[in-house]
Amino acid sequence: MSPTSETAQGGRRLVIVESPAKAKTIKGYLGPGYVVEASVGHIRDLPNGAAEVPEKYTGEVRRLGVDVEHDFEPIYVVNADKKAQVKKLKDLLKESDELYLATDEDREGEAIAWHLQEVLKPKVPVKRMVFHEITKAAIQAAVANPRQLNQKLVDAQETRRILDRLYGYEVSPVLWKKVMPRLSAGRVQSVATRLVVERERERIAFRSAEYWDLTGTFATGRAGDPSDPSSLVARLQTVDGRRVAQGRDFDSLGQLKGANTLHLDEANARALAAALENTRFSVRSVESKPYRRSPYAPFRTTTLQQEASRKLGFGAKATMQIAQKLYENGYITYMRTDSTTLSDTAISAARAQVTQLYGADYLPPQPRTYAAKVKNAQEAHEAIRPSGDRFRTPAETGLTGDQFKLYELIWKRTVASQMKDATGNSVTVKIGGTAADGRDVEFSASGKTITFHGFLKAYVEGADDPNAELDDRERRLPQVAEGDPLTADEITVDGHSTKPPARYTEASLVKELEEREIGRPSTYASIIGTILDRGYVFKKGTALVPSFLSFAVVNLLEKHFGRLVDYDFTAKMEDDLDRIARGEAQAVPWLKRFYFGEGTVEGVAADAGNGDGDHLGGLKELVTDLGAIDAREVSSFPVGNDIVLRVGRYGPYIERGDKDTDGHQRADIPEDLAPDELTVELAEELLAKPSGDFELGVDPATGHTIVAKDGRYGPYVTEILPEGTPKTGKNAVKPRTASLFKSMALDTVTLEDALKLMSLPRVVGTDADGQEITAQNGRYGPYLKKGTDSRSLQSEEQLFTITLEEAQAIYAQPKQRGRAAAKPPLKELGEDPVSGKPVVVKDGRFGPYVTDGETNATLRSGDSVETITPERGFELLAEKRAKAPAKKTAKKAATKKTTAAKTTAAKKTAAKKTTAAKKTAAKKTAAKTTAVKKTAVKKATASKAASED
């Protein structure tokens, strides 16, 4: 029976989904007797601050939003921005005969459905409607087969929410007191930050080793063709039976691991190459093995994020934003899933498409199934796949831009998962000879031929174009046999340096968190967004670099809240929460154990403290006694030569000596300087310019010395007042001071520039109404001021050039929220995959930003107008949207800004490659230069800072 005919007998039904976009799509699949409305996400939650808590609650309950003394009873409040929507839903419910709660079928969706039921208090029958794809068949099947609310899922999600609230609201204030105001800690975000910091520590401790090897190009003497090349390239493998050292043979301190491994330096490598100039080589062995490679499983949430990052350059958050749109508009199945399972319908659709597009030869006899790799995976969900019982090819969807790219990626992966293995042969050829000095050498070459491409015809992991990549995956070697003579056309000497462990990218951090079973895969995108927004991590290209601030935070947490950032403990907590979801453990005893450290509850994770001794201390005890935490100690890190890095309330700095001694030196350092780039040499260079002062000359009008300084709020110029000038009281004299223009730098600003800057504000003239118009430079950029009416200027140079007539023309225009007329975009990035609107880069009062006309996102450190890509622009917008709705924030604490000249970090030896026949060039070293920029540590309100994950 169709929903339409059913409704005719059953009256009017209200269906509540989470998003307006989903409501619009579903409405078209149901009959006129159905009203489909959106809750627009969560309608109720724990209070964001004490002001939202009902007056009857006091003390700790009011602060936490949870009554820890009465079985951790949560205090829920309807979100202020959802009250109008709740009223609308209540009004619709009054006119309905049934209520269908159609939120997502996961823990969070189940909780939203429960909150809707609790707030709406329906007097009509309530049914839980679930689906994993938004197609007509799926929606009608969901209506016909409703279920009841899963209270176990609701309880588990509530426990998770309470746990995260306690963690965030108890630990974050410790960071405010001991490190910096308005920081945040979270059950998963703090552990993720620790991972990034630990990787940077490994990079700091790393010592590079230089090693050399030889590569030979050997000719068979036959005419070659694509199927049988005439030569092959092989690398030196052994000398007199000893294996030649490669990068993997050195430890992190640059020491050789194995005693029997031969470490060639440059001199020995060149001597060996010279001794091989007239050597006669021959094939010593040819080993051939069958090659087989199976397709990858269909996507789950984390593997989609990783592949979208590698192949498309999307951040985790941007990937989820785009996938959300594809799901809501009926193109793919639900995108938050741990499962790699495909339904029978999906398998049939994929197999049909394999036959249609690639032929029956590419279809295996039996459907492929994939085992779950994620602990506690929700197998009721499917993998992420194209929706429907017949998959639309990417060309058939009509999608464009990033939505097309992501759909194509999902479609290819799904179809390839039901294709045959790729098969072929891998070959290893060993080539030997005797050097002029009698040493025996052996070179090795590896090749691979693919005889049947199988799934590689449709999908190659990590590559954009499968057709182009197929050739790259084949490395053909000449047809040679044991004993065949070979001629060395060239022997090259190659120099290498071992590299420190690579920093995490969003993709590799997601993979690491999942492998350690920390947090839920569905939350990883928001976790990464949080640590970026908090200023704990910033991006250099795709690499995630920890800030010095994060070093201080992690140091404090490791020393005083060890278990809270312990990887195994955090994973065990996640496992416990899953046990609660399955009904195998009770929430309240578990929360008591975590918070109060009381009793012994079987199967529950250990105490929240450091775990020393038999006492099982809880979180409450840990945050109560803060006297043992030395704020200066946790924020101090030795650099060398008695120089110490300190993280202060306004940013990081270095100093040498005691503050009150004559030899004391101090210098600010840029917050986006990668910690592994702060060497002793760089620190000495920064300290060599105490306070960053540059003497520019003497003001002829006053006789005062004019200097340029690098201050807390950025570079500026000021005058040095004569000794004896009163600095306090009613006769106090303040020195003239002015910030540098964006186009100026400390090391290039002149005395003339400084005097012009300090002459501001400039009187432009008097308007017809008798009011004076002045040109001024403020915190948000250049502007005109007439009385209380301010108007922005387009450039700082206008401060000195704008005429009265031009100023009057600006004031004659209607005021646009205090801004000047719109300026042309600096760059166009294309259509946003989420809003569908054109994205451009504009210059605003806070600097360059990307916008689609609805959402604005400031470019971050490492981004520039010249280098920003469309994908990066879309990612910034997606991250900004994810933080909506915007909450009123407290005033930001000041952060220090340093704009020094480029500095040189530790020099690293560049790998060199020269032929034996050529004269050796002098060794060169590649010097790192670090562009010093400002990164403002991002802060949120107290309530936001104490966030969950």
Each model region followed by its residue ranges:
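Intrinsically disordered, low-complexity regulatory segments
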Residues: M1-R161, E170, L175, F250, ...
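Flexible beta-alpha connector loops of hexameric P-loop NTPases
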Residues: I75-N79, K311, T498, R516-E517
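Conserved short loop/turn motifs at secondary-structure junctions
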Residues: G11, D104-E105, M180-S184, S288-A297, ...
